[in-house]
Amino acid sequence: MEYNPIKKVVSGNYAAAYAALHARVQVVAAYPITPQTSIIEKIAEFIANGEADIQYIPVESEHSAMAACIGASATGARVFTATSAQGLALMHEMLHWAAGSRLPIVMVNVNRAMAPPWSVWDDQTDSLSQRDTGWMQFYAENNQEVYDGVLMAYKVAETVNIPTMIIESAFILSHTYEVVNMIPQELVDEFLPPRKPLYTLTDFENPIAVGALATPADYYEFRYKIAKAHEEAKKVIKSVGKEFGERFGRDYSKMIETGYIEDADFVFMGMGSLMGTVKEAVDLLRKEGYKVGYAKVRWFRPFPKEELLEIAESVKGIAVLDRNFSFGQEGILFTEAKGALYNTGVRPIMKDYIVGLGGRDFTVRDVKAIAEDMKKVVESGKLDKEIEWYHLKR
């Protein structure tokens, strides 16, 4: 069957819901929280209208939502959930249980700033604070990537048995409508066949225990296997991304999407929706004579250090745009990028720009101002400061 996209004008949240529908998820357990709520409302609408054969489990909290997802996934079901900010934080214990149990749950997290003070706007700190739980993380630039990301996440997660977050920006994507090219169900089914679990709690001929006690003689190897699965996931991500591109014309074979790096003196590096702004600004800056490119990190976990090294070898500087902050240190992507390059001996000059916290606007004008600053840094070979809180009111 030839691929002819079904074009729908949808929000990022609706794109996530349609992707869950097309992935033929069997169980959804979730608790509503702004700005995630409309994902679950749309799925409930699919069920009420008879469009979806999904077991929906209403729960009293996000902790319970993930607990229900863990139980359902352990029976062999394809499971979906969604959350945001404080809800994700409440799930924290269960995120470890899902990853440690090697359950390929897919969750959409709508990036929202952590309270207090209360905020419902975009900020990556909620998802990045869960980076050590064992979940893979994919950051979507636009609504199309939300839809595509969910479909690819199931194929990757079910291959390596690691749960996966697809992460979108609050309101900038979650409640903003744009055209999304959806895939006919028959073609999704060809790309994403039913899950074939390694084990299930319902295989009574081969009984298993999940989450049992491991003594010091055994625990270490369990951690090692998860670490190895994340390394293996890099190959699977690239393979699945390439296959997706061949089938549907949107290539995801690179964990870091790049542009104009062939002759760039420096690049902007960041994740998520802000990279759409960066791309527009870079096009304008190139016309003005700036030798600048971009590197959009799609997958933060597993971290694509091999692709980062290739980029770092070709440029003099990297301006890291962090819509997050780790108190007592620096922006989280900045830390990861520096650490990945340290033992390679490849050391382009790097500066961390803290931008857009709590949903503060990040515009083309801002990118241009940062480009001017980074140009001076690269030309002088000296940092005036390592961390720039760009948006501070002065």
UniProtKB/Swiss-Prot annotation:
Reactions it catalyzes: 3-methyl-2-oxobutanoate + 2 oxidized [2Fe-2S]-[ferredoxin] + CoA = 2-methylpropanoyl-CoA + 2 reduced [2Fe-2S]-[ferredoxin] + CO2 + H(+)
Keyword Electron transport tagged: no
EC number(s) per entry: 1.2.7.7
GO molecular-function term, one example from the UniProt record: 3-methyl-2-oxobutanoate dehydrogenase (ferredoxin) activity
Pfam name, any one: PFOR_II
Annotated transmembrane regions: none
UniProt xrefs under InterPro entries: PFOR_II, Pyruvate:ferred/Flavod_OxRd, Pyrv_Fd/Flavodoxin_OxRdtase_N, THDP-binding, Transketo_C/PFOR_II
GO BP terms in the entry: organic acid metabolic process; response to oxidative stress; sulfur compound biosynthetic process
Keywords on record: Oxidoreductase
Catalytic class of the enzyme: oxidoreductase
Subunit field text: Heterotetramer of one alpha, one beta, one delta and one gamma chain.
PANTHER family cross-referenced by the UniProt entry: PYRUVATE-FLAVODOXIN OXIDOREDUCTASE-RELATED
Protein name as catalogued: Ketoisovalerate oxidoreductase subunit VorA
Organism (species): Pyrococcus horikoshii (strain ATCC 700860 / DSM 12428 / JCM 9974 / NBRC 100139 / OT-3)
